[in-house]
A protein has these predicted regions:
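ATP-dependent carboxylate/acyl-activation modules
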Residues: 1-242, 249-276
Length: 276
């Protein structure tokens, strides 16, 4: 996995990258101090790439499939807050922070394999469902990832009594299992002792459900319209309060009605962001 930066890599970013697992980084530039830090990662084998910040891709993209070449214009759509002016729901309040999150969601979707749905919270992408044949499958997949992100912030998880000699990747893997339905895999005698100083109490299904119910203020973007209200039902369970989607379904009324049921503010952008 590579880290892609849109600005010059500074010392703070390089210090953060040094402790995170990745195969390389690409950026338009690096400060001398940042480059010196990155050179020490992976014993000097960390891949550091610099891209020309003035590079502009071709306006026409092409793809060859079994000898047939397909061409189309590159997606140059500008994602701005102007896309959020058409709000057909009863709740029309989309504050500035939510508009920022919706923009992040749509920008993410612009470069994500369709069909795709993206959840964003506090300026961070917390769940992406991509490459699915069904829109609701995208919403479920991204919602499940958003739930995992939130569960990792549960006090029981934050206070897991890890041994000092357990490395960060192993801690991360243990947390992933601990918050899943397979939590017993890290808690039996003979296994928990390798990870923890004392045996943790499990995070029960009821506790997880109650914790997820506390998640609010999530923004969701979709790369095309929602055909049914079931997408909204699933999104609501992961704390979604703001939605941006293209609109244009013959069942838009049902989708709007479901948003109103949960007081969700939804903008219809009129913009499809399909990417194949």
């Amino acid at each position: 996995d590579f880290v892609a930066l849109s600005d010059v890599c500074d010392v703070e970013t390089a210090t953060l990258l040094k402790r995170e697992v990745s195969d390389g980084v690409i950026a338009p530039g690096y400060s001398d101090e940042a480059l010196a830090i990155l050179k020490t990662k992976k014993k000097g084998n960390y891949c550091v790439l610099q891209i020309n910040p003035d590079y502009k891709p071709r306006l026409v993209e092409s793809k060859e499939v079994y000898g047939v070449t397909f061409e189309q214009e590159r997606n140059e759509a500008k994602i701005t807050t102007d896309l959020f002016k058409n709000v057909p729901t009863k709740n029309k309040n989309i504050p500035a922070a939510a508009q920022r999150d919706l923009m992040i969601a749509l920008i993410t979707l612009k470069y994500t394999q369709s069909n795709s749905v993206c959840y964003v919270k506090d300026g961070m992408t917390i769940g992406v469902g991509a490459g699915q044949q069904s829109r609701v499958h995208c919403t479920r997949l991204a919602g499940n990832k958003a739930d995992i992100w939130w569960l990792r912030q549960n006090p029981k998880v934050l206070n897991l009594p890890f041994r000092d000699d357990v490395r960060r990747p192993n801690r991360d893997n243990a947390i992933d299992v601990y918050i899943s339905d397979d939590y017993e895999d890290v808690l039996p005698d003979g296994i928990w002792q390798d990870l923890f100083t004392e045996k943790p109490e499990p995070l029960t299904r009821e506790e997880k459900k109650a914790w997820i119910a506390q998640l609010h203020g999530v923004a969701l973007g979709s790369d095309a319209f929602f055909p049914f209200g079931d997408n909204i039902e699933r999104a609501h369970r992961s704390g979604v309060d703001y939605i941006a989607q293209a609109g244009g379904s013959i069942r838009d009324d049902n989708v709007i009605e479901t948003c109103d049921k949960y007081n969700i503010a939804m903008a219809m952008t009129g913009l499809r962001l399909f990417h194949h």
